[in-house]
């Protein structure tokens, strides 16, 4: 099985779509956790305008670039539902744009590895507030098998998860 090295930034695209028309409401607001899942927001949303919130469409990712005080984990989640969410403008939202090269579920498996948490912490910059920037995310070098092999790995992983539940 041959692997090909890519820069992640060549395979993903930043999304800056905002909820500018208030299409999405309070029930669509989510947060992400260090368990790498979307969660209900814990913020007091009373009187908060949702127009600057970023749109997280199905199959999109959202992460918090600030890595300080996160238990050495990065806060990132993959929208694996058919629903569209909105997140605070402090998040970075992106999607896999080269779907013929990279499977989004395979990428999420990559993000769930402890090695990725260590990588993102090591490449976070700042003093009081360390940040894993979009540029650092794009600079990641990732070795990928063919898209068919990626999909097989994802299928095996999901089958293992289903057997555990």
Where are these predicted regions, by residue range?
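Well-ordered mid-protein domain cores that form the structural environment of catalytic cofactors
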Residues: 108, 112-113, 121, 141
